[in-house]
């Protein structure tokens, strides 16, 4: 049985997000730092959020190559919500092409066997249905070592090379509980763009998560919070682990969107170690009171 939190979500989670507009950044589509939408299906949530963000055309120019980083790590079906929602993925791919993208690629360095994860998650079929290509990321030769200036622990990493060759980089995590890091959202999802994840786990995981954001932050972060795993993450055990929140978050600030997601899962952002470290490193804004935030309920 899946618990539904849609009725009280606005007051108890998204309602905690401040709706603040500074004089230097007037409110209105295209002027928001973060958009939070609730009460809809994954596609309608996404479309309204992007409308408030100013449209995908803000991020993609004609002829550009786009790479998408969903969560497609787990060999489980969509109804288990361990991976990014396939309907959302298809809508994003289509939107990228409408904005003028020449090519749209998606990939993940999966935790379970990659072909089964791609197929059974529904993500690969969704990307293809939208006209994009799902790329394999299971072989070390697909990765190139880079330096990460300013990092404290993760000073080097082997990064997926096609990401480096792309013009636009969009991060599409699913909001979940995680046994090792309490939450997994946008910052944690980037572990799927590197080859040696074991180094992170052996060398201060939270610091490595923050360090990697110094290399290349996504141009846009779209957080799937429609069906949310609130326990037994990141893979989950059954649908009993899930809460139907029917929400979606969008921001170009990877720390801000994680801070908002942390609140949705009932945590103060500063209590999540990698978020606090990222704030201290200047990765983004953890204080949501300093941002222009648009909250929308689709009734």
Please state what every model-predicted region is.
Residues 1-299:
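N-terminal and secondary-structure boundary signal
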């Amino acid at each position: 049985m899946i618990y539904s939190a849609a009725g009280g979500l606005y007051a108890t989670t998204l309602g905690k997000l401040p709706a603040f507009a500074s004089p230097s950044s007037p409110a209105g589509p295209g002027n928001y730092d973060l958009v939070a939408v609730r009460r809809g299906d994954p596609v309608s949530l996404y479309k309204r959020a992007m409308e408030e963000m100013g449209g995908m055309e803000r991020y993609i120019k004609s002829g550009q190559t786009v790479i998408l980083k969903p969560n497609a790590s787990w060999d489980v079906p969509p109804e288990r919500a361990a991976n990014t929602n396939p309907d959302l993925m298809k809508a994003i791919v289509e939107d990228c092409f409408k904005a003028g993208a020449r090519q749209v690629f998606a990939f993940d360095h999966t935790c379970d066997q990659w072909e089964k994860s791609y197929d059974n998650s529904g993500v690969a079929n969704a990307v293809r249905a939208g006209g994009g290509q799902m790329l394999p990321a299971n072989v070390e030769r697909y990765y190139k070592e880079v330096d990460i200036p300013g990092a404290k622990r993760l000073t080097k990493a082997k990064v997926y090379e096609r990401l480096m060759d792309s013009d636009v980089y969009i991060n599409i995590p699913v909001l979940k509980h995680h046994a090792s890091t309490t939450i997994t959202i946008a910052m944690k999802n980037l572990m799927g763009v590197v080859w040696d994840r074991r180094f992170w786990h052996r060398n201060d995981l939270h610091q490595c998560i923050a360090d990697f954001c110094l290399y290349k932050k996504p141009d846009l972060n779209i957080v799937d919070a429609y069906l949310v795993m609130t326990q037994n993450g990141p893979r989950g055990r059954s649908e009993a682990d899930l809460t139907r929140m029917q929400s979606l978050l969008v921001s170009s600030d990877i720390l801000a969107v994680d801070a908002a997601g942390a609140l949705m899962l009932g945590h103060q952002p500063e209590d999540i170690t990698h978020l606090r470290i990222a704030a201290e490193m200047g990765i983004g804004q953890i204080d949501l009171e300093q941002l222009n935030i648009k909250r929308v309920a689709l009734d």
